[in-house]
């Protein structure tokens, strides 16, 4: 039995959010990110003043709420215990460590192993990121990432068979083109240092 997209996402609340099982949370996330993107990107609002003003407004509202509660004998506002746990810090640090080690392993494979294929793959990815970065800034890319994370799993769950078929076809085409590039270009790059060594001997 194939594992569904919802089951493959290990965190239940996150799965409910991006699969639109939690519609309220999904609309809240999409609406808030859209509002923030509009404020920063279109209205020219700066991030630091936004954070400071939001904190200032929150503190003033809570202070007035607490004062009015004392005056009118109403219950005080219930605030959650806001703190970052050690487990969360260790989890984030471990995820960052794994990512950094992966990057260093790829760099070592290219430098020490002289892996031309890996160099080609990394170069294509970095060039693509650079090309996209010429047209979109970091905030817009981050916003698009949130929107796509809410759309792609939901659409894939609905049209999984059709998408798998198209992706399989696309993968075969890319593999065919990659083999051609590998035969024409990469093998020549690999062969040149070998020929130079033979001539020196």
UniProtKB/Swiss-Prot annotation:
One Pfam family of this chain: Reticulon
Record's keyword terms, sorted: Endoplasmic reticulum, Membrane, Transmembrane, Transmembrane helix
Parts of the chain that traverse the membrane: 25-45, 46-66, 135-155
GO cellular component labels: endoplasmic reticulum membrane
Entry superkingdom: Eukaryota
Gene Ontology terms describing biological process: response to bacterium
Range of residues in the leader sequence: none
Domain (Reticulon) ranges: 14-201
Membrane topology label: Multi-pass membrane protein
Keyword hit for Amino-acid biosynthesis: no
Location in or out of the cell: Endoplasmic reticulum membrane
PANTHER family linked: RETICULON, RETICULON-LIKE PROTEIN B10
Name of this chain's protein: Reticulon-like protein B10
UniProt lineage: Eukaryota, Viridiplantae, Streptophyta, Embryophyta, Tracheophyta
Protein encoded by which gene: RTNLB10
């Amino acid at each position: 039995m194939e594992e569904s997209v919802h089951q493959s996402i290990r965190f239940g609340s996150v799965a409910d959010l991006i699969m639109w099982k939690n519609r309220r949370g999904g609309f809240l996330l999409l609406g808030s990110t859209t509002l923030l993107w509009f404020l920063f990107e279109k209205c020219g609002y700066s991030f630091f003043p936004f954070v400071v003003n939001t904190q200032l407004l929150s503190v003033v509202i809570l202070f007035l709420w607490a004062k009015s509660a004392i005056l009118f004998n109403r219950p005080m506002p219930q605030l959650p215990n806001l703190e970052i746990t050690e487990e969360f810090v260790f989890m984030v640090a471990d995820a960052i460590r794994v990512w950094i080690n992966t990057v260093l392993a790829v760099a070592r494979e290219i430098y020490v192993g002289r892996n031309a294929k890996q160099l080609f793959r990394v170069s294509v990815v970095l060039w693509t990121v650079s090309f996209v970065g010429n047209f979109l800034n970091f905030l817009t890319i981050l916003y698009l990432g949130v929107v796509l994370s809410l759309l792609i799993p939901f659409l894939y769950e609905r049209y999984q068979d059709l998408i798998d078929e198209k992706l399989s076809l696309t993968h075969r085409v890319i593999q065919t083109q990659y083999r051609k590039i590998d035969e024409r270009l990469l093998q020549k790059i690999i062969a040149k240092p070998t020929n130079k060594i033979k001539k020196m001997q």
